[in-house]
Amino acid sequence: QEWDSPLVHYGGPSDSDRPSSVYGKAASHIKLRIDGIKGASSKYFWRDKSRKAPHNAYTDLEKVLEAYDYTPEMRDPFQFSSDISYTGQMVDTIYLPFESGKDSFVTYTYNSATDKFERAMDGKEFIDAATDKPVEVQNIIVQYADTYVLYNDVKGRKMVDVKGEGKAEFFIGGKHLTGTWEKTEYEEATKFYLEDGQELTLKPGNTWIHLHPDDEEIRVEYRES
């Protein structure tokens, strides 16, 4: 809701009477939906047969933009500055754990030459299918949120509550910062703040937000100064 954008996805739970349903009451606010399972596959999605299904489906965001049947409101929820420089410990690697296994991690390793974080999964480089190069991220936000398994859901589906407030961690320019997040209404933008109360400023570039259970910790390794 806070982005006023279409929901682009490839299937999902569709039991209309369950809170997890991508077509249920919780999704009633969606203005435009593009679902690769239900008819949108041929126009907006394709599969890379050299990669293992089901995680080999891709889309073209320029084509998605052509699908708008309404005029979206231009929103700019983040502050950016190419001159921003934070003090703090220099990060080497960020470890974000999965519940599927104790040794299963998404990692981001800081590359000082590019000033970006390179993504890997379980120790293997996460390669961009379009460029055949490791995925690089300029800014990383870890947003801790209340996460719980839905009652009586045999598949263990989870709900993440993104309304309210909580702690957050930021990784910008190789530095590790801590702070908070706040979202007063579902349609309002999520605001991120540093420990001193100042609103977060990011470096120009792509920004990835990881929603993380608020009762679990991430691990960070630092470089020697």
Task: Locate each region found by the language model.
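A surface/extracellular/periplasmic glyco- and lipid-processing/surface-interacting theme
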Residues: 1-225
